[in-house]
Amino acid sequence: MPLRATLADLEPILAFQERAYHENRAIKGVEPLPLSVDYTGLFDTMEFWIEGPRDNPEGVVILDPTHEPPGDALFIWSIATAPDQRGKGLGNKLLDFVERRARALNRRAVTLVTNSRLPERIDWYLRHDFVIMRHETLTYRIIVHMRKNIASD
């Protein structure tokens, strides 16, 4: 199970994110959103989780419980695996963790956005029962809003 990270884990998280999103930068031709912000302030409102050694994570999950209306969904701000861990089931494990965390927070769904230029990522989420809610055009990118319901009425 991932460990809750603190601001003391910032350097390894930043190094991890740079490695994990390096390929996306080349594909998209723009800076990935998770690499374009100052993480220091994010620790005040978001949950950071590390899988693997704290000083050299194999996976990182960043959740924003304040993004959606209370009680509705838990927003995945970032979910990533180290390049050498891809294809080993770690992404599935991290997504399972996110769903458990959403249930623990009494959320009905999990939501996220991804770039339209990453069809293999979109397909992966679709295989995990996410649905596409809408496309949004931003400067230099089109993002895909996705949602997975985890609770029934």
Model-identified regions with their sequence ranges:
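Active-site acidic-Proline motif in GNAT/NAT acetyltransferases
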Residues: 81-84, 88, 116-117
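Conserved beta-strand-loop-alpha-helix junction that forms the acyl-donor binding cleft
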Residues: 112-121, 138-142
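Conserved active-site tyrosine of GNAT-family acetyltransferases
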Residues: 125, 130
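Residue-level marker of the N-terminal boundary of ABC ATPase nucleotide-binding domains
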Residues: 73, 122-124
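Residues forming the Rossmann-fold NAD(P)(H) cofactor-binding site
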Residues: 92
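Acetyl-CoA-dependent GNAT
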Residues: 7-84, 95-97, 101, 136-139, ...
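Extreme N-terminal starter segment of soluble prokaryotic enzymes
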Residues: 1-2
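Conserved GNAT acetyl-CoA-binding A-motif
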Residues: 102-114
